[in-house]
Amino acid sequence: MKMISTPKYLGPDIKTILAEKGLDSDGRLWRGRLENTSGREVERALACATGSYSLEKLLAFISPAAEDYLEEMAQLARQLTVQRFGRTIRLYAPLYLSNFCVNSCRYCGFHRENKFKRTRLTIEQALTEADIIAAEGFRDILLVSSEDRKIVSIEYLTELAKKLRDKFSSISIEVYQMGVAEYAKLFEAGIKGVTVYQETYDRQAYAYYHREGPKSDYDNRLDTPDRVAAAGMREIGLGALLGLADWRAETLALAEHAHYLVKRYWRSRVSFSFPRLRPAYSRLQTSDHLSLGSCHLL
């Protein structure tokens, strides 16, 4: 199978970028700057914002001072959205394949210690569900499962993708982490995008919430989008689970991650999701500061 080569990238990797900027910790290095950002700085960011990214502009836009400029930011966001994407909205539908999981994440109702009936759709069942989704007019589909590669194998995903690719214009997956060769095999089968949430960029918080299982490896998780792009995938979905750590620090880290990927893998497009905490049954104890209301967004 053919791997996708990219122009030589001479910059640092994402682990180095986050570490040097203090964005793989609890964000305390940035807290003072955020709190001391003035309204005048927000106005300057609005005046010079042409759609190009800079960490300084983003810092101004998510600072407490920016709460007084919500309408101006909304107008600018709309202007840039229409300029880049036109007056269209791209919709996709998720198809849940399995809730078997080998990880033990404190915040997740699917973690392996929870005792409930687990299910994995057969290929035939998945195709039936996909037909219903297609009949509703959706042409983009996201195949989702908890993380257990023995239950939802590469072969399973490959077979399913080959049977779905004539029904949908775009097939993406949100499953477990893989290697470059595995992603390349799925790409050849018709899967063009991968969503992988870092959940939190704070190393200490990550270690606390992801107790055991393959997902407990912070660096492997962080490097996954690189492997996705190296395999030729056209769409890379990123996200942080808002509520696990300081949302402003997470936003800065997420933006730096995306900026790095765009520079290094220019053939792939990067998108964001903003998942948030919702109630879920858990046999595991979580920290006292974990709160459904802790993600105050502008």
Regions inferred by a protein language model and the residue ranges of each:
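Glycine-rich, proline-tolerant flexible connector loops at the mouths of alpha/beta enzymes
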Residues: 62, 93-95, 112-114, 142-154, ...
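Active-site beta-loop-alpha junctions enriched in small/polar residues
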Residues: 94-96, 146-148, 174-178, 199-201, ...
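Conserved C-terminal portion of the radical SAM core fold
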Residues: 145, 168, 219-283, 292-298
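Glycine-rich anion/phosphate-binding loops
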Residues: 115-128, 217-220, 253
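Flexible, acidic/Gly-rich N-terminal and inter-domain linker regions that tether
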Residues: 1-95, 103
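Radical SAM/AdoMet-radical enzyme domain recognition
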Residues: 105, 139-141, 154-241
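Canonical Radical SAM [4Fe-4S] cluster-binding loop centered on the CxxxCxxC motif
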Residues: 83-125
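Short Fe-S-cluster ligation motifs
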Residues: 128-148
